[in-house]
């Protein structure tokens, strides 16, 4: 982390703690507001987590097939999230007002199936929770 990256990227080389990461997710769920203050505009959050890929782009066969892509993360329905280095995952669901994280420390992140298993379990739980909310 002492050397500048060849290509500047918003998430490239970021180092954080689970506490700070969760705070960031809380801010997203608050549409830019945390601890009673706006640290980001609501519009910036809404645009950043929305699907920014034009409908004319064919995603067939790509890693984004069936999903959208916001500013640095995947957008699927009311859920927005992304994966990081060393196997980490983070997501927020705006309809259910939930946030979730997976913290691991191994590289490459594909070395173990835990990310895929976590995503599958999370999506199943979210589907159940949406169904319960709809039925209520």
Report residues per predicted region.
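Catalytic loop of the DD-peptidase/beta-lactamase superfamily, centered on the K-T-G motif
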Residues: 1-136
């Amino acid at each position: 982390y002492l050397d500048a990256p060849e290509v500047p990227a918003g998430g490239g080389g970021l180092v954080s703690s689970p506490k700070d990461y969760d705070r960031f997710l809380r801010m997203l769920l608050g549409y830019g507001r945390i601890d009673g203050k706006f640290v980001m505009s609501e519009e910036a959050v809404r645009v950043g987590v929305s699907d920014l890929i034009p409908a004319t782009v064919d995603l067939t066969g790509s890693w984004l097939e069936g999903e959208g892509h916001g500013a640095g993360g995947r957008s699927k329905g009311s859920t927005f999230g992304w994966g990081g280095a060393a196997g980490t995952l983070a997501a927020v669901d705006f309809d259910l007002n939930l946030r979730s994280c997976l913290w691991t420390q191994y590289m490459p992140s594909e070395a173990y199936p835990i990310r895929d298993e976590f995503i599958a379990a999370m999506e199943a739980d979210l589907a159940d929770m949406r169904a319960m909310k709809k039925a209520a």
